């Protein structure tokens, strides 16, 4: 019932149980239904926390993307590589060094932009890859945005990814998915620089 009145929904696989998974799908489907009515645009964000270390989480993520059609798919480099079906090295909730996007390695930025762009085209969702460099790809164009703001200290703070998911959902309630992702990443990254 609550999801039916919400303008946006954020879903995280970070602390998932069977009961939470059921609620996640009920809410995701409610948002999808509401988006297809005269009541205005409604959208969801899925945060792929830990899909590289749990087949249960991976299957939930794939199912949510298929059945609920989120506007935004968010994850670190390992998680996005995994959901895109490309080789990945992550085994936990943190990105592996081999999958990380780094300003010091321009090829990692280009490679991840390509992977995110392909996933965006396949799913119809904006794909947000988080890390030292945030990559945002839209299904509506062939451009991926790379955001180089932030601080190395942000990686030492547990929960910054969850914060970004919530900020993205907040912006998503008032604007399109691409703008919401860019604004959310800039908001958190610039705050991290202070």
Segments the model singles out, each with a brief description of its role:
Residues 26, 50-56, 79-86, 162-169:
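Low-complexity, flexible helical/coil segments
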Residues 34-37, 68-72, 98-99, 153-154, ...:
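Glycine-rich loops and low-complexity Gly/Arg-rich segments
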